[in-house]
Amino acid sequence: GRAAVSTWNGDVWLVSGIDEDLDRLEWRRFATGLFDPLGLRIVDDVVYVHGRDGLTRLIDINGDGEADCYENFNNQVYITPAFHEFAFDLQTDDEGNFYFTKGAPVNPGGRGFMKIVPHHGTILKVSKDGSTIETIATGMRAPNGLGVSPTGIITSGDNEGTYMPRCRLNWIEEPGYYAGVKDTAHRAPVPDQPALARCWMPMEVDNSSGGQVWVTGKGWPDLQGRLLHNSYGTCSTYLVLPERV
């Protein structure tokens, strides 16, 4: 098999030779010079990358294994010099719309925030054709990853810090979700209470949340349709056990 991997340093690599043994992997740089690309999605065999300056479509015109065209797919996202406004993840729904998250501009040292702009601490949606962008959820600190279910439920983690006592798992079924960070609420008045988290995670379980994955393939039949949560901080994967009461 093959995979595409983006790095914070600005590269996209194609990895071939993926099998059970993983003893003959070949890496080839497909693209370079991107702006902190922490999200990547392959749609119809075309690589889309999410960087701090928006979404880029990478096209290999002559078939030599390297991107020749770096197409500006959507650049409507706000950007600032803040080091912490990370551009996290890139997912799609069944209709082809794109979803990603934008970190809040945490001050060096971790307490408080630098200048806030409208897309800080949010989950954003870009239309299938790249023409529009809209905010789905606000009030986040560092939503390092998300997931989109086959039925359209959006999930995300968030990392502990200012206004975020522990890492939480957000469960978003409709636009307007507010996770609790007042500086990134982007609405007036600011809600008195945040939306309920699906769960809060102790530090020893997760001290820096990653994204989520809905199991849809046949490789793990016992987990079919279930949600997995990934922890960046503890390098772990957890099975989420939701219960509606």
Where are these regions (language model features)?
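Beta-propeller domains with acidic blade repeats across secreted/periplasmic ectodomains
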Residues: G1-V245
